[in-house]
Amino acid sequence: TRLQKKVKYHRRSISGRKARIKRDGERIMAYLKIFPIKVTDKKALDYITNPDKTDEKLLVSSFGCSPETADLEFSMTREMAKKNGMDKGDNLAFHLIQSFKPGEVDAENAHRLGQQFADEVLKGKYEYVISTHVDKNHIHNHIIFNAASFVDHHKYVSNKRSYHKLCRISNRI
């Protein structure tokens, strides 16, 4: 039922990792949260590219795919990984949220920082779509990236160690 779907989604989002990045005891820029997408990446991609939230899609960009067809391209990459025996785990993609304090950055700089962050984290191996949402009082980036690499077909490993690496990279940028 509809309620069960909401509860299931809520449980998945709670299982995501999140933390405010700190340096020398003081809070700085980004608040990070990552969680797996296990059921459908199309709905998540539609949500993050919503024109009402992204300044009419001016704040949407991608790497290795087109934002409009990313779900199909992600799927084709996963199929190739499966054919090569590299499709382990049930994660289709990962959803990363990078939030900034109100007034800390403008939309264009937030988007640029998000792109730099995604490029450094994913090292040109994973397709991704990034969007910057400006519909709330805090500007935030949504980055959805394929769980399977289009270069070597290995799956992205999300654990505490990889999460702390994400925090360090975001902190540096």
Summary of predicted features, one role per range:
Residues 3-173:
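N-terminal nicking endonuclease/strand-transfer module with a His-rich metal-binding environment
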